[in-house]
Structures are given as C-alpha cells and as structure tokens.
C-alpha cells in the first residue's frame, strides 16, 4: 500500500523508505517554533537537559505575539526572559516587537517554512504551514524544549482523510467558509489525530491565503495536520518569499485513507460557527438577525492582506453601526504597512474601525478587545469556546472577513450580499 503526502514527508525525515499509520518514528526537524506564552516553559525544561546550546541557531523561531506589545508587567517579564535566552543562545529568528507579527502569518512571510519541511510549534495552530505543502503540527512546551536541544522529535504516523474539493465557490465563499463547513460536517473530533489532505480542481480557485486559513483550522476538527499539494500558486508564493530549497512530495495513487469526502464548493454558502464549538455551524441564511456588540477582523486565521482588502471593500464609504466596536488587526508589520500604502487603513478608520498593531490579542482573551458578560462578537478567529475572548457568559461567532465586516455595519450577523 502506498503513502499519503504526509506519510511521505515523515518517512523522508525519519530516514525510512516507508511508514504506515500508527507507526512510532523519530524525525529530524526543519524548524522549531515558540511564542511568548509557551517558550518560557520550554526554556525551563531546556535548562534541565544539561545542554548549553540549541541544535541549530537558524532553525528555531521565537515570536512574542500573544500579549505583545506587552500588555502588563507579567507579559513584559515573560518576553524579557525569552529575549535573554534567545540572545544567550544566539537564536537568529527572534522577532522583536518592531518586526514581529502573529506567528503563523509571519513565518511564511519570512520564508522560514517551505514545501516538504517538518515543523513543530508550541502553539496548536502550527498546522497552518500545511498550506505550503509542509508537515507542521502543534506540540507542548516540553517537546519544544527537546526539539530545541536535539533537532528531533517523535510522532505516531497519522492516518488520513482525503477531501476532494470540486468546482468554483460562490462570490462570498472563502477558505474560512469552506473549513467551517468541513468542521461542521465532521465535528470537532472528526479528524482526531488524522491528516486532513485537501485535493481536487477546487484548489484552482483557492488563493494561498484561503489555504492558510483552512490549514490553520485543521486542529479545530482534531486534525494532526492539514496539508495541500504543491501547485503553481504554492511555487509562486515560495519564490516570492524565500531563497530556501524546497521539496515536493505527492501522495501515491494507492495511498490508503480512512475516508474520502467530496465537497462541491459551488453549493456552499457563507458559514458562521455559533457558540461554543467550531462545529456548531449554520449557513448565513440561518444565522442572521443575531445582535452583536463587537467585530474582530484579524488573527492567524484571517489577518492577511486579502482579508483586509475584503473588509475594506465592504466598509469603505460606510459607517460601522453606532455602538458596535470594530477591531482590525493586521497579521504582521509588513501586512500593516501594505494596508497603509494601499489606503486600506485610512478607509477602515474613516468607517469607524480601530486598527491595532499585530497581536493575537483578543483571540485568546488576552487584550485589545476583551468581551464583558453577555456581550457577543463576530470574529474571524478560530475558536469560540466558553470564555475564549473574555467573560464566560460572552459569546463568539466565527465567520469570514466578509461576514464580519457586513455585520459591523448592521450590528447583527449579516450576509455580505445584503450590504
């Protein structure tokens, strides 16, 4: 029996001719990632190993993004601790506040991840880089520490679900709507410890930003990773962002999948995830008329330039409804600057939105948009668990930038076609 795309990447990095689902393997790592929340714990564990250097100064990336710019003294102390460790170890890819971004927007932009890589990160949404044809997955701080010390980690080889995406999506259907539809269909544990492998002619209509969004949310279906085949769009992106060499892996024709699911993208509608799980989805025609207090457009899921362009296209020349807070967070400094140069920021501010420096911020209930008791938020983020963005009696509705921007104008969940 042949191997899936994920299995081929893992076999190569384990120095094996082949692997099969359920097999325990040790692999060599191309990149180890941490942030301001998870890295301090990893540093503490690293110090217990009795080693005095990291395995490779250029293959570790540390991105303070959750509570930065520092929201309080505790956050400042954590970042200081991480900064001092990075300086001591000579880690080349520590991103200070002036050059930082939300980690999963920043690393592809900086060209640190390429097709064929194996990447681990002490953040659950590390699966984002599957959009580039890499195997990437979230791990805990202890595994991050071991990865920094040895350049290796172990995996149980995942089985896979193949998603065959067909046809062209309708006007307002984005990668966010597609992945919400999939999560709603299979459930938050529907791909538990499985590779979600996306194929089909529908990929021709999905931008790289759409793919980043979809791979990012693979974990919300329980997936070990989400991954896309490398095509012309991938290669164009890689050529623009990196000088690193990449390697293309393709699934064998006789690869074995636990399930094969076909999805006709032309039949999908804008989709909203209701509280308090990402799989509690409804199409926009069954989701409207829910009154809201706040809108957040940003995050590692939807903070890229195309997302801001979509929001601008809906909000330009209009006004955010009085009493509604509309918070826009570009994913990186580069995206922020590009949005400034394109006049996007000006149009958003004139519409009544507030624009933040890059940060995870409100997504995890950290800062820059926390919800009070009883408040509701339409957010382009990736999780809507109880208390995720603030008070345990607040509510988060996950949606695309188009739905979020339209909702900011009306003060209720709104189909972008209607504004």
UniProtKB/Swiss-Prot annotation:
Molecular function terms, GO-annotated: 3-isopropylmalate dehydratase activity; 4 iron, 4 sulfur cluster binding; metal ion binding
Catalytic activity line of the entry: (2R,3S)-3-isopropylmalate = (2S)-2-isopropylmalate
EC assignment: 4.2.1.33
A GO BP annotation: L-leucine biosynthetic process
Cofactor note: Binds 1 [4Fe-4S] cluster per subunit.
Protein's UniProt keywords contain NAD: no
Names of the cofactor(s): [4Fe-4S] cluster
Keyword vocabulary terms for this entry: 4Fe-4S, Amino-acid biosynthesis, Branched-chain amino acid biosynthesis, Iron, Iron-sulfur, Leucine biosynthesis, Lyase, Metal-binding
Residue numbers binding [4Fe-4S] cluster: 300, 360, 363
Transmembrane helix in keyword set: no
PROSITE patterns attached to this UniProt entry: ACONITASE_1, ACONITASE_2
InterPro entries named among the record's database cross-references: Acnase/IPM_dHydase_lsu_aba_1/3, Acoase/IPM_deHydtase_lsu_aba, Aconitase_4Fe-4S_BS, Aconitase_4Fe-4S_dom, HAcnase/IPMdehydase_lsu_prok, Homoacnase/IPMdehydase_lsu, IPM_dehydratase_rel_enz, IPMI_cat
Pathway: Amino-acid biosynthesis; L-leucine biosynthesis; L-leucine from 3-methyl-2-oxobutanoate: step 2/4
Similarity field: Belongs to the aconitase/IPM isomerase family. LeuC type 2 subfamily.
HAMAP family documented for this protein: LeuC_type2
Function: Catalyzes the isomerization between 2-isopropylmalate and 3-isopropylmalate, via the formation of 2-isopropylmaleate.
Summary of subunit composition and partner proteins: Heterodimer of LeuC and LeuD.
PANTHER family attached to this UniProt entry: 3-ISOPROPYLMALATE DEHYDRATASE LARGE SUBUNIT 2, HOMOACONITASE, MITOCHONDRIAL-RELATED
The protein's name: 3-isopropylmalate dehydratase large subunit
Organism in which the protein naturally occurs: Clostridium botulinum (strain Alaska E43 / Type E3)
């Amino acid at each position: 029996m042949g191997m899936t795309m994920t299995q081929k990447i893992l076999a190569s990095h384990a120095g094996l001719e082949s692997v099969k689902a359920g097999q325990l393997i040790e692999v060599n790592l191309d990149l180890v990632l941490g942030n301001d929340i998870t890295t301090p714990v990893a540093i503490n564990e690293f110090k217990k190993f009795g080693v005095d250097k990291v395995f490779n100064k250029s293959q570790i990336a540390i991105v303070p993004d959750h509570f930065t710019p520092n929201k309080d003294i505790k956050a400042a102390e954590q970042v200081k601790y991480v900064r001092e460790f990075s300086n001591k170890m000579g880690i080349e890819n520590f991103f200070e506040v002036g050059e930082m971004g939300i980690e999963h927007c920043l690393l592809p932009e900086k060209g640190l991840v390429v097709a064929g890589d194996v990447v681990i990160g002490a953040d659950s949404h590390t699966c984002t880089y599957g959009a580039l044809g890499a195997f990437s997955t979230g791990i805990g701080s202890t595994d991050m520490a071991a990865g920094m010390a040895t350049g290796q980690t172990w995996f149980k080889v995942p089985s896979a679900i193949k998603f065959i995406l067909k046809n062209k999506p309708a006007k307002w259907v984005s990668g966010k709507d597609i992945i919400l539809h999939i999560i709603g269909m299979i459930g938050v544990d529907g791909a538990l410890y499985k590779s979600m492998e996306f194929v089909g002619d529908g990929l021709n209509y999905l931008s790289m930003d759409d793919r980043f969004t979809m791979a990012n949310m693979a974990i919300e279906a329980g997936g070990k990773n989400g991954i896309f085949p490398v095509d012309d769009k991938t290669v164009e992106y890689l050529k623009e962002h990196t000088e690193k060499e990449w390697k293309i892996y393709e699934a064998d024709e006789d690869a074995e999948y636990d399930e094969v699911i076909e999805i006709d993208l032309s039949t999908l509608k804008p989709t909203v995830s209701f509280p308090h799980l990402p799989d509690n989805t409804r199409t926009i025609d069954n989701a409207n008329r829910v009154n809201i207090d706040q809108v957040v457009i940003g995050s590692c899921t939807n903070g890229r330039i195309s997302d801001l362009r979509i929001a601008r296209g809906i909000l330009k020349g209009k006004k955010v409804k009085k009493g509604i807070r509309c918070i826009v967070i570009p994913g990186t400094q580069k995206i922020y600057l590009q949005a400034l140069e394109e006049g996007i920021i000006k149009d958003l501010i004139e519409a009544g939105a507030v624009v933040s420096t890059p940060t995870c911020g409100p997504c995890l209930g950290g800062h820059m948009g926390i919800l009070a008791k009883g408040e509701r938020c339409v957010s382009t983020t990736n999780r809507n668990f109880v208390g995720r963005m603030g008070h345990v009696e607040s509510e988060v509705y996950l949606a695309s930038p188009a739905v979020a921007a339209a909702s900011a104008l009306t003060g209720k969940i709104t189909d972008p076609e209607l504004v």
